[in-house]
Amino acid sequence: MRLRLLAVCGLAFIVLTAIAQEKKDPVPPAKGDAPKTEAPKAEAPKKDAPKVDAPKVDAPKVDAPKTPDPKAPAPAGDNPLAWKFTKDVPFYQEMTTTTTQNIKVQGLDVGQNQQQTFYFSFLPIKQDGDKWIVKQTIEGVKMKIDIAGSPVSYDSTNEAAAGGTNTALSEFFKAIKGSQFTLTLLKDGTVEKVEGRDEFVKKLTQSNKQLEALLNKILSEEAIKQMADPTFGVTPKEVKKEKESWPRTVKLSLGPLGSYENTYTFTYAKQTGDIADIDVKVGLKYTPPGPDTAGETLPFKIKAGTITQVADEKTNKGTVKFNTKSGRIESSKIDIKMSGSLTLDIGGTTTEVTLTQDQSTEVKTSDKSFVPDKKQ
C-alpha cells in the first residue's frame, strides 16, 4: 500500500561570541619633592564581557500529521488497476445482458429474445489485511423474454405493470429481489468466499420445490462467485504497463447442463486522464455433462454437444473502462457469439438441436443507485 510520509525538520542554532572591552584610568601624582616618577601603568582590571543571549530562533512550523479521512478510498498499492474500497461507502451497478438465440429442433425454428437487467449495491464493511468483506445486494431486477412469440416480462420497480403469460417465471424473478451475499475479496479482485448462497436457493424455491434439486446443482458456490466476476474479475494481480496483457480463466459447472471454461485475455490498452481502457478477448469452451450426471430434474438430458465461438471481428471481445482515481470499473461491454449442436434425450427419444446465440453484457457503475423511482 501507499504510505504517507511526514517530513521532519531539524532546528539550526546560532552561537555569538562575546566582545571584551578594556578601560584605562590615570593614577594621581604623589605629594613632596620626590622626583616625580611615573607610576607604573596599572592594567585595568579585566572585566568579563557581558553575556549576550543568543537571539531566539523560532522553530519552523511542522504541520501535524493529517488524520486519514474515513471516507477516502483505502490505498491499493502501486497497481493503478487495483480496486479501492471505502468502508461503509457503497457503490452501485447496473448490469444488462441482451441475448438473441435461434434454436432449430425437429424441423422447427424457435427464436428467443431476452433482456435482463440487475441492479446491485456493494457495501464495503470491513478490511482484513489485503482482503475486503463486501456486502452485495440485488436491489432490483427487470427482464423481458420472448419465446416463439410468447412474451414474459417482470420489472421489480413497476410490479403492477408486469405482463406476460408465464407467471411462474415472473415469480422466480420476483424472489431474486432483495437477496444478499457477503463476498470476501482478495487483493486482485478474486472472490475467495461467498456467504448467503443457501438462503438464496431457499428463497428461489419457496414457490416451486421442484426446482430445488436443479438449482442446488446449477447455483453452486462457484457459480455464485462468478456472479461477481464481471465486477471484480478484470484487474491484474501485478502492476501492468500500457500494452501489457494478463489472462484469467473461469470454470463454471452447471450440473446437468454441462460446464463452461471461459478464458479472458485483458490488455491495458491506454490511459486517458483517470480512465484506463482495458481490451478484452474471450475464449469459450463447452463440455457436455458426463453420463453419470443426473438429469431427472430437467425435462431432457444432454447426451452430447459441441458449442464453439463464431469467428467475428465484432464479437468475442469487449472493452472495460477502469477509473484509476476512484479504483473501480466505470463501465464495460463484452459481446460473445457462439453456435453449436446438442443431442438431447427427451422422454427416451433422441433429438438433435442446433443453435446460434449472440450475447452482449454491459455494466455501469455509479455512486448513486440505478434503481429508477417507482412509477405511481
Question: Where are the regions that the model predicts?
Answer:
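Signature of exported/secreted
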Residues: K24-P28, K47-Q376
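D/E-rich low-complexity acidic segments and tails
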Residues: K24, A34-P40
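Sec-dependent N-terminal signal peptides
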Residues: M1-E22
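Low-complexity, polybasic segments enriched for Lys interleaved with small residues
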Residues: A39, A44-P45, A49
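Low-complexity intrinsically disordered segments
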Residues: L11-I14, A34, A64
